[in-house]
From Swiss-Prot:
Pfam families reported for this sequence: His_biosynth (PF00977)
CDD domains, A to Z: HisF (cd04731)
GO biological process: L-histidine biosynthetic process
Leading EC class: lyase
Organism: Methanopyrus kandleri (strain AV19 / DSM 6324 / JCM 9639 / NBRC 100938)
Enzyme Commission number(s): 4.3.2.10
GO cellular component term, pick one: cytoplasm
Residues of the active site: 12, 131
Domain of life assignment: Archaea
Gene name, Swiss-Prot/TrEMBL: hisF
Main location: cytoplasm
Full protein name: Imidazole glycerol phosphate synthase subunit HisF
Subcellular location per the Swiss-Prot or TrEMBL entry: Cytoplasm
Length: 272
């Protein structure tokens, strides 16, 4: 029997408070992280993801406190990411109570960090976040765009971005997904920058291509505005988990409602 699909609220944390932006811009305050996480835990979340987008050292210290407070009353897997740059950052997050640590920019700049962390803490603790955006294929990218797609507007590829989705790098997202699996990552957190915050649905094509390319679990992220979008990403892209923020933070749907919607449409989920 196939594993149950996971529903994961994402909490973007800045200076100890939860915020949510549209396409990584225009942040809104959505409350206390530990309280929100506990609310989602009680209402059937399968996991929690904290992404720390603080810029200051003080914000980073506040994040450790958030993780510690959350771990005292939330008993589902918790992933922490944002600002992770070395093995000591992994250790700090795990010691505070995280079950998994998500790394993005530092992994692109130093891929050996993935294997180093996996060797020390185990692959199950290592999540590589991949932020990807579809871009028109230009001649200067043909040597790095290993996977090329086309539509009525022409050819395009999925490009990796770092530093919170602000900075493009010459790296094909599907190639990078394969590489992080080889290096020992236990899971991929895949965000479509195009879809993030729009509430118009996940990027099915991007998610499907990455899921087909790797054997480790893939969490789809970016664009969820309705439970039907989760049905699509599970059935059409075969994602292992769906991450969402806006639809939960502002009370648009409860996790119970989402799971009921999925179950009615034949998607296996853990019941609340």
């Amino acid at each position: 029997m196939a594993l149950a699909k996971r529903i994961i609220p994402c909490l973007d944390v800045k200076d100890g408070r939860v915020v949510k932006g549209v396409r990584f811009r225009g942040l809104r305050d959505a409350g206390d992280p530990a309280e929100l996480a506990h609310h989602y835990y009680r209402h059937g979340a399968d996991e929690i993801v904290f992404l720390d987008i603080s810029a200051s050292p003080e914000g980073r210290r506040l994040m450790v406190d958030v993780v510690r407070r959350t771990a005292e009353k939330v008993f589902i897997p918790m992933t922490v990411g944002g600002g992770i740059s070395d093995v000591e950052d992994f250790r700090r997050a795990l010691t505070a109570g995280a079950d998994k640590v998500s790394v993005n920019t530092a992994a692109v700049e130093n891929p050996e960090l993935i294997s180093e962390a996996a060797d020390i803490f185990g692959s199950q603790c290592v999540v590589v976040a991949i932020d990807a955006k579809r871009e028109p294929l230009k001649p200067e990218h043909e040597h790095v765009a290993d996977h090329i797609f086309s539509n009525d507007d022409g050819e395009y590829w999925f490009r990796v971005y770092v530093r919170g989705g602000r900075e493009p790098v010459d790296l094909d997202a599907i190639t990078w997904a394969k590489r992080v699996e080889e290096l020992g990552a236990g899971e991929i957190l895949l965000t479509s920058i195009d879809a993030d915050g729009t509430q118009e649905g996940y990027d099915i094509e991007l998610t499907r291509e990455v899921c087909n390319a790797v054997s480790i679990p893939v969490i789809a992220s970016g664009g969820c505005g309705h439970p039907k979008h989760m049905v699509e990403v599970f059935k059409e892209a075969d994602a292992d988990a769906a991450l969402a923020a806006s639809i939960f933070h502002y009370g648009k749907f409860t996790i119970e409602e989402v799971k009921e919607h999925l179950a009615e449409r034949g998607v296996r989920v853990r019941q609340c």
